[in-house]
Amino acid sequence: MCDGRDEMRRAGKSGRARGGNSRAGAGRLAACAACACLGWCAAGPATAQSHPATQPAVDRERTFRAARHAEAFLRSLAPKIDPVRLRAEHRMKGKKFYVEYLSAWREICLVGGESERRVIRAFLAPIVARTDTDAYHNLADSSDEEFKQDVISYLNACVLHGEFGFDTTRYRREIARIVPRILAPAHLDRRGIDNTMAIVYRLRQLGYEGGPGYCELFRRPGCVVRMHPDLTQLDLDNPLAKQPVYDMTHEIFYLTEFGRTPLQCASEKDLRYVRRMHASLLPIFIRKRDIDAMAELVMDLNYLKMADLPEYATACEFLVTHQNEDGSWGDREHIGNMAKAILQVNPNYLLDVGQYLHTTGVTLSALCYPLYASAAGPATRPSAVR
C-alpha cells in the first residue's frame, strides 16, 4: 500500500492501519537469498493451485515497452532515494521507500538481459552506497517506534542487496545484532498478522529460524484469508478503511511465498473465498481507477495461479494501458485527492516517492511476473494444513 497512512491519521481520517514453515522451506529460502544472481526467481517450476493456470493475456511487447518507460521515472527519483535523508528531512519511512525503489528495478532486471542487468547494477551502486553508514544501520539503538516502522524494510533491503550482487557482509553483521530484538515478544506482539509473516519470511531468507509459523498466524483472529469478510462492503474510497484488502493481498504474498508454493495452511473453502473476492474487487478498483490496489490483486492471482479469471485479463489490460507520461503508474486524480490530506500534516512529503513509486513497483511486478516466472505444471490440490 502507498505510504501516507500516518499522515492521514493525523489529518483526522478514520480507519485501521494496515506452523507452516518447515525446515525444508527455510532452507529453500536461505538458498534463494544466498544467490547473487537476479535470475533465481525463475529457476524452478511453480507448483500449481487447484484452479488451472492459463498464460495471461498480457502483450509481451507492450509490457517490455512499459518496463523500459518506467526506467525513466525510476532514474528521475535517484537523487531522492536516500533512506536517512528521507526520514530526517521529509518525515518519511526512508528504508521503506529505498526497498520499493530497489524492488521496482528488480522487476525490470528480471525481464531484461544480462547486459541490461549490469547497466542497472552500475546505476544502483552509488545509491546502495548511501546505506553504508551508521545512520542507516541504526536499528540496534533506535526507538521502539522507529524499529517497528523500519525493521521489515531493513531485512528486505539486505535480501535485495544480495540479489543484485552487492556485498552484504556488514549488513548481515548488523542484522545479527538485532535478531533477538526482532523476535522478542515486546516487538512481535505489536505486529499484525501479515507483518509478522513478512518478518518470518525475510528472516528465513537470511538464514534465521524463530518466530511463529505461518499456520499459527493463519489461525489468529483477523486473518482475512481465513475469516472471509466481504471486502466489497468496505468504504473502498477511504485509504484507511480499505486496509483489509491490503491485509489479504499481503497474507497471500507470504502464504504463497510470492508464488513459490501453493497457498499454505488454507482449505479449498479459503481458496474459493480468495478467488471470489479477487473477481469481485478487481472491477470495483478498475472503475475507481485505483491502480495500486488493482496491481496487488493481480499479483495475488499470479502467485495463486488463478490467471484464468476473466477479471485478471481485464485488469492487466487496464494496467498496461494506463501508464503515466513520465513512466510512472498511479491515477493523478486518485493520488491527488489523498495528497491533500497528507500534505496538510507533512508539507515536506514527496509525492513521487511516497505514492507513485509504490504504485509503479507493484504494477511492474503484476505485469512482469508472467514474463519471467516458469510455466505452471499440472493443476494439483494445494496442501491444506488446517
Each predicted region: which residue ranges?
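Short, solvent-exposed mixed-charge patches
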Residues: 381-386
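Bacterial N-terminal signal peptides
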Residues: 30-40
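An alpha-helical repeat/solenoid feature that recognizes helix-turn-helix modules
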Residues: 88-114, 138-167, 188-211, 237-263, ...
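Extended, basic/acidic-rich, low-complexity regulatory helices/tails in eukaryotic proteins
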Residues: 55-58, 88-89
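N-terminal secretory signal peptides that target proteins for export/translocation
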Residues: 1-24
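Long, well-ordered core segments of solenoidal/helical folds
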Residues: 62-88, 120-140, 168-186, 208-238, ...
